[in-house]
């Protein structure tokens, strides 16, 4: 059984409770327990692509367009908001150190803009929680080394996201 320690930081709610209430985010907010359940199920599905470890650690930061734009500018030289950023801790195959195998393996951080997710949910005509799950699953795949430099790999990644969402009871229609 795959174990995951998830650190959820809801900076969107913390920084602007009024905006969160006005936008309807509070009604669509995903609980920490739900996030943990989703990540646990997703990592069970993706187990064959996980490096060996007794457990895994992931950071999830929910934020706004202003913060994600600053992060995007700093790390990707793209001075604009985006929907999701993933910062993988394991960019290369690491040699197996017996001492490291005894500790949780840090996979990286996922940052999601609630503002952008809300816009995209409206465009896709599904709920904000569905869009958050979609974006977070996308970020998780990036943490595990998935990428989409071409159409074929993008389609494979999107198909895997559909599988991940289906595993947590979320049905989504995506046009490839």
Curated annotation (Swiss-Prot):
Zn(2+) binds at residues 138, 142, 148. Binds 1 zinc ion. Pfam families: YbeY. The keyword Zinc applies. Its EC number is 3.1.-.-. SUPFAM superfamilies: Metalloproteases ('zincins'), catalytic domain. This is Endoribonuclease YbeY. PROSITE patterns: UPF0054. The keyword Repressor does not apply. It comes from Trichormus variabilis (strain ATCC 29413 / PCC 7937). Single strand-specific metallo-endoribonuclease involved in late-stage 70S ribosome quality control and in maturation of the 3' terminus of the 16S rRNA. Keywords: Cytoplasm, Endonuclease, Hydrolase, Metal-binding, Nuclease, Ribosome biogenesis, rRNA processing, Zinc. Belongs to the endoribonuclease YbeY family. GO terms for biological process: rRNA processing. Its main location: cytoplasm. InterPro entries: MetalPrtase_cat_dom_sf_prd, YbeY, YbeY_CS. GO terms for molecular function: metalloendopeptidase activity; RNA endonuclease activity; zinc ion binding. It is an enzyme of class 3 (hydrolase). Disulfide bonds: none annotated. Its cofactor is Zn(2+). It is found in: Cytoplasm. GO terms for cellular component: cytoplasm.
């Amino acid at each position: 059984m795959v174990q995951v320690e998830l650190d959820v930081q809801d900076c969107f709610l913390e920084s602007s409770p009024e905006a969160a209430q006005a936008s309807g985010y509070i009604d669509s907010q995903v609980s920490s327990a739900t996030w943990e359940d989703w990540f646990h199920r997703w990592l069970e599905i993706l187990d064959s692509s996980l490096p060996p470890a007794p457990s895994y650690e992931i950071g999830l930061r929910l934020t706004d367009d202003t913060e994600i734009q600053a992060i995007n500018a700093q790390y990707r030289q793209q001075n604009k908001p985006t929907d999701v950023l993933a910062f993988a801790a394991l960019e290369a195959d690491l040699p197996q150190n017996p001492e490291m195998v005894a500790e949780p393996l840090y996979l990286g951080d996922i940052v999601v803009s609630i503002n952008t997710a809300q816009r995209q949910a409206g465009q896709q005509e599904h709920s904000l929680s569905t869009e958050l799950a979609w974006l977070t699953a996308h970020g998780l795949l990036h943490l595990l080394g998935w990428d989409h430099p071409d159409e074929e790999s993008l389609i494979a990644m999107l198909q895997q996201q559909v599988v991940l969402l289906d595993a947590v009871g979320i049905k989504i229609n995506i046009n490839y």
